[in-house]
A protein has these predicted regions:
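Acidic, Ser/Thr/Pro-enriched low-complexity segments and adjacent helix/loop capping patches
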Residues: 1-176
């Protein structure tokens, strides 16, 4: 089920909430001029968020916060490069006992939050959602509803606020 809409017809927050509530899997692309933001969702949770304007990677965030050393980051990256099956860095760091799942989840959350904050500042643009397979590579699942609550949704319309309230009442999705 592809969705293509201008921001005038469907706000990014509204699309995220609909995709979250309906537990959709696929890719959201938001474009404004030459700027592009990409989000990947699996069962309604964000597993990937990227923007050329926000380049801070997970390992760098964890080093900056003092959660891991540069040496241990490199150790995990080296191991990741040797794996035959893809696996996200956060999972490798946890498996090596270098950091807790909670610390990685918190860092991934802040990484995705920065991308969503940027998207919510756009006043115009086009949204495109395409259903697609998203392999489970051990990614951390971030609930878009939780992100919108943390960011604050005072400026959003009544439909979005109602959807957020509804989404907060549903059972939580399992996280990796």
């Amino acid at each position: 089920m592809p969705i293509i809409a201008d921001f005038d017809d469907l706000a990014p927050a509204e699309l995220l909430l609909v995709l979250s509530l309906s537990r959709k899997t696929g890719r959201v692309t938001a474009v404004r001029g030459d700027q592009k933001i990409v989000l990947t969702l699996r069962n309604g949770s964000i597993v990937y968020a990227a923007s050329p304007a926000i380049r801070e990677r997970l390992g760098d965030i964890l080093v900056k916060r003092g959660a891991i050393s540069e040496h241990n980051l490199q150790r995990a990256l080296d191991r990741q490069g040797l794996l035959l099956e893809p696996k996200v860095l956060g999972t490798i760091l946890v498996e090596l006992g270098l950091v807790s799942t909670a610390v990685v989840h918190q860092a991934v959350f802040s990484q995705f939050e920065a991308v969503i904050r940027q998207l919510l500042t756009w006043d115009r643009g086009e949204l495109n959602f395409q259903s697609s397979e998203v392999p489970d590579v051990g990614a951390y699942l971030i609930d878009p509803v939780e992100l919108l609550v943390v960011i604050g949704y005072d400026g959003l319309g009544p439909l979005v606020k109602g959807l957020v309230r509804l989404a907060l009442k549903r059972p939580a999705a399992k996280t990796a």
